[in-house]
């Protein structure tokens, strides 16, 4: 229990929701294309989908997360969009020590699966951040606006030059689920780049093949990916994170496992509804 107290009172707990969002960060990166809005074939998700996850540290449940694709289409920049919201929060006794209640959302182009706008509402103990990111894919610009918590007015926006079809976490999540891994070989390396928290990243991801994985939501055949982690103060080594996606047409994140400097943590799928395709559950 002392290790749990240390974990929830640390800066790592303040960022625990990152474990839920990490599969989306992997997906945010893709090779560049020439078209402004290249069509991405999507047979993996639809409006009305709902995914629920639990976050744990060792044997202790510390939080839950949800991913929701809204029932109605939205419109932005005269383009039809999915509206997607991701929520992550601590639960139970952990709330008393380190209350986390985060919301991440985006308007995602239904044809190209790129974001037109994304937003974050971060509530982690006393720390608060409200941010809006606007994507202009025609001009290749990203505009970031952060709310001043005292005046409740947005600060001076910051504008970045962007590569074609740049994605955020949510847009990356949608894009990843359309990827075909059937022709990948074990230990293939995918070199990817994208935009997250005011920075552009390049990251290597290893494809480790397929295996059976059991989570609360059921037993699945899964695609296994391992990002090569850059040096940081949270995850223990470059091979510290593993991600499992369902090996079916839905390609939903099933599980994330992370070795941290102060213990092991993870995320797993607990329930789902509104999937576009029947899930391939194993007996």
PLM-predicted stretches and their roles:
Residues 138-196:
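Active-site/ligand-binding surface loops and adjacent short beta/alpha elements
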